[in-house]
Amino acid sequence: MRLEDIRPQAGSTRRRRRLGRGVSAGQGASCGKGMRGQKARKGGSTRPGFEGGQTPLYRRLPKLKHFPRYRRRLEYTLVNLRALADLPAGSEVSLESLMERGIVTTNDGPLKILGDGEVSVPLTIRAAAITASAKVKVEAAGGRVEILGS
């Protein structure tokens, strides 16, 4: 076998479109571009955002200075109380302990506890954030909540 003997897999290549080569060729006359108009001419179409010569929206709006271009939202690792219901009494709940137990599989950021579900045993929760409803439910069960970083 030599390099010049190599051929593409059967059916893997498509024939190129031969435009303007007669009506029966399938792409004759107007070459699939319809009838007249700017999009039918050579040189292709207009750029994105072009409004036909009218001042485009991105130039009509004023420049806003002194604003950060991109403000990154803090992403949390979210856990509902429903996932903590089976933990033994007196357990400490933190991102590390939840990952060890397999309740959380990926670290998407600081731990945030959400209030969906019920908890019946006292737990010590160490998290970056907790919703008000979750805090009420944990403290009603005799647990403690410790907010990290404050």
From Swiss-Prot:
It comes from the Bacteria. Residues 1-57 are annotated as: Disordered. SUPFAM superfamilies: Ribosomal proteins L15p and L18e. InterPro entries: Ribosomal_uL15, Ribosomal_uL15/eL18, Ribosomal_uL15/eL18_sf, Ribosomal_uL15_bac-type, Ribosomal_uL15_CS. GO terms for molecular function: rRNA binding; structural constituent of ribosome. Part of the 50S ribosomal subunit. This is Large ribosomal subunit protein uL15. The gene is rplO.
